[in-house]
């Protein structure tokens, strides 16, 4: 497989000053909306101040100490520098690489411990605010059922940051998080154990082949996964989400903005692809997600963009 490793010193597309202003305005609008929806009690205001600052303060020097390793991989254009002890047969081929030059890919405790801090640095502290954009459409579609002990599956849950937002908005829900990485699930367990209430069920597995029976979930969420999947894998994940949802169940999908919905930020998307190792990003930003949803059997309800995130809401007919 061609991993599409970026150049060691990637040339970038110039970002004009006016675009920087538009990015700043878009980020401010996201943060204002986040505060407004918390004030409307869609989720606790405490979630807006939920970042583990003391933990990150300890790990921040580790991010800097990791930079020489990242630069060495970039120089070698090595995007398959993974822990030797992993069994590669346990993972799909597209997963076995150093996405955005992450040390160990997604396959070590060290990677899992640094990941959330690295993402917040990249997105200027807005990652959780973007994750919370799935809450309003999810609650709207659930209606009165939001107070019931419904089952909600989060595909590619990673370190559990989305589950943490969902726990705040749906305190009675039975939450399930699925991820390919045992290391990231261990980190998720640590984060989620800090909050009151029932601990979400954490399951190691592949979104293309969900280990659940047909029609057992009332809602499915999936955040920041699709841009790291080849097209056929995206379709399989949607097919599986449709399968495990009950008739009338809701899917809320959040991922990077795309060229069609945010053409103004095209240079930013191009630079993201060039600088970071994101081998499927170019294909993703041109992909027709509503068409894929319909192909799986979903009815697309709405799609909206917030800063760097696009959110699609869809329902399984029945």
What label would you give each PLM region?
Residues 208-220:
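A short acidic, Gly/Pro-enriched loop at the edge of an enzyme's catalytic core
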Residues 153, 161-209:
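Class I SAM-dependent methyltransferase SAM/SAH-binding core
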Residues 1-89:
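N-terminal accessory segments
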């Amino acid at each position: 497989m061609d991993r599409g490793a970026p150049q060691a010193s990637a040339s970038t597309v110039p970002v004009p000053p006016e675009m920087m202003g538009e990015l700043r305005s878009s980020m401010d609008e996201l943060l204002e909306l986040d505060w407004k929806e918390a004030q409307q009690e869609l989720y606790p205001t405490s979630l807006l101040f939920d970042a583990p600052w003391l933990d990150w303060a300890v790990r921040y020097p580790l991010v800097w100490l990791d930079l020489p390793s990242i630069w060495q991989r970039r120089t070698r254009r090595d995007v398959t520098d993974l822990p030797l002890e992993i069994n590669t047969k346990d993972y799909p081929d597209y997963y076995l690489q150093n996405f955005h030059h992450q040390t160990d890919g997604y396959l070590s405790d060290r990677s899992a411990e640094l990941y959330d801090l690295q993402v917040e640095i990249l997105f200027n502290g807005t990652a959780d605010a973007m994750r919370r954009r799935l809450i309003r459409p999810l609650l709207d579609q659930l209606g009165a059922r939001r107070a019931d002990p419904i089952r909600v599956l989060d595909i590619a849950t990673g370190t559990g940051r989305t589950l943490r937002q969902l726990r705040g908005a749906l305190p009675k829900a039975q939450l399930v998080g699925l991820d390919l990485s045992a290391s990231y699930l261990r980190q998720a367990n640590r984060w989620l154990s800090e909050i009151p209430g029932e601990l979400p069920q954490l399951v190691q597995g592949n979104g293309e082949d969900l280990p659940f029976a047909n029609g057992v979930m009332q809602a499915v969420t999936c955040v920041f996964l699709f841009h790291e999947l080849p097209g056929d894998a995206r379709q399989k994940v949607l097919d599986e989400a449709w399968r495990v949802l009950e008739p009338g169940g809701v899917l809320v999908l959040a991922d990077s903005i795309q060229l069609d919905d945010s053409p103004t930020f095209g240079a930013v998307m191009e630079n993201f692809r060039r600088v970071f190792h994101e081998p499927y990003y170019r294909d993703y930003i041109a992909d027709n997600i509503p068409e894929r949803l319909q192909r799986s059997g979903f009815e697309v309800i709405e799609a909206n963009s917030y800063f760097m995130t696009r959110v699609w809401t869809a329902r399984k007919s029945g």
